[in-house]
Amino acid sequence: MTRQTITILLIFFSFSCNAQQIKIGTWTTRDGGAYTGEIVSGKAHGKGTCKYPNGNTYEGEYVKGKRQGNGTYQFADGERYEGQWFQDQQHGQGTYYFMNNNKYVGLWFRDYQEGHGIMYYYNGDVYDGNWLQDMREGEGKYTFSNGAYYKGSWKSDKKNGKGEFNWGDGSSYVGDWVDNMKHGKGLYKFSDGDSYDGEWKNDLQDGKGV
């Protein structure tokens, strides 16, 4: 018997053993969820559906009793997550549908919106940029439904650092921001062609400027 033949037989035997271990059955999670689907060694492993006492449901992949892989989690209040899971947490690429009709499409880290993602707001606004623990953080662009936009730095869900705000009517501001206010040095161009280049404090012109 050749080495290649032996290798093929070993692979076939391994798959056969794994197939024998997988059963279709029921299982109860630690938090009282009723699972129905593929089971290995007495735990959810593979594809299945779980219904929880609070009305939430999950349909997707499991690894050793935990949500892992791809799956959809439907909340009783109408919110829904579709995407990747790791160790029972929303982790990787996923889409979240909020009860208020907002929709987030992007990266997740341990149940948080983290990394690059796009939030489509119910009123037509869109944010495309970086996130940290469910908040806008780092570089990103927020476009309002009327065409106005802010492009620049964010911290703790607010405009902070260097950024540009364009109102779409010919007026714009490029400069420093602190907690959503023009603060520091910046250039404001008015729609009539005038401009102010100088210091700002709490959203108002302050100190020297031209």
Predicted segments with their positions:
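Sec-dependent N-terminal signal peptides
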Residues: 4-15
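Extracellular beta-strand solenoid repeats
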Residues: 49, 72, 95, 118, ...
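A structural motif
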Residues: 25-26
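Conserved anchor residues at repeat-unit boundaries in beta-strand-based tandem repeats, strongest
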Residues: 34-45, 57-68, 80-91, 103-114, ...
